[in-house]
A protein has these predicted regions:
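Positively charged n-region of N-terminal signal peptides that target proteins for export
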Residues: 1-4
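Repetitive helical segments and hydrophobic/amphipathic motifs
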Residues: 11-12
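C-terminal motif of bacterial Sec signal peptides marking the signal peptidase cleavage site
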Residues: 15-18
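Protease-labile, long low-complexity intrinsically disordered regions enriched in Pro/Ser/Thr
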Residues: 21-218
Length: 218
């Protein structure tokens, strides 16, 4: 998994000679950043009763890792109400995992500037608002926190259509409720000001699919 994410700014004309990256953000917080990879999107499937489920991904980029392996571009599993997934060989999984490289431009026009030491508490609150349950939030936090808490600050923006329009899931049978939480973030040495994001609530009903993932911009 790549830990160093390269980025480019769309607003190249806004760059001033001699400015630091953090000064650029302070002067022009409405920016788009390009990651090199989308890290660890994982998909949980929660049917009301055990059922066969097929999941395919139409991704505007190159997949670099999937687990379990896809067959003919899709996962086919038996999903149980507790989230356990079983493949044709009888092997079980907690979720479906993928990672890829894309040129998607992530939107940082709104978000949060969080001191590194406050990152865990921030994520606990934000992920709960967004609709992750305790297990899902725990797995999200233990994956990302080691990369974030030692930074002076973290610039965090949750991506919605910007992400889902470039990583399209097709799930059969169709879920009753789908939640896709994707966090784009960047370490900072000094704080910046930007409008706070409004985080939408999510209601689980019937067959529910939950995904989380993220991209570090460094």
């Amino acid at each position: 998994m790549k830990r160093t994410i390269l980025y480019l700014m769309l607003a190249a004309l806004a760059l001033l000679a001699g400015c630091t990256q953090d000064e650029e953000l302070s002067a022009k917080p409405v920016i788009y950043l390009y990651p090199e990879s989308d890290a660890k999107p994982v998909d949980y499937l929660y049917p009301e009763a055990e059922m066969e489920v097929t999941v395919s991904l139409d991704y505007d980029g190159e997949l670099t890792c999937v687990y379990p392996a896809m067959e003919n571009g899709a996962w086919s599993v038996t999903a149980s109400p507790d989230g356990t997934l079983t493949d044709a060989s009888g092997q079980t999984y907690n979720y479906l995992y993928w990672e890829g490289v894309s040129a998607t431009a992530y939107d940082f026009s709104q978000g949060f500037c969080v001191p590194g030491g406050d990152t865990a508490a921030f994520l606990e609150d934000a992920l709960s608002q967004l609709g992750l349950n305790r297990r899902e939030a725990n797995e999200f936090i233990v994956y990302w926190l080691p990369r974030m808490e030692a930074n002076p600050y973290n610039l965090i923006a949750f991506q919605f259509d910007t992400y889902t329009d470039h990583a399209r899931l097709t799930i059969t049978p169709e879920p009753d409720a789908t939640l896709r939480v994707f966090m784009a973030w960047r370490p900072l040495s000094t704080p910046v000001e930007l409008p706070a994001q409004e985080l939408p609530a999510f209601e689980r009903t019937g067959f529910t699919v939950v995904e989380w993932g993220g991209a570090e911009i460094s």
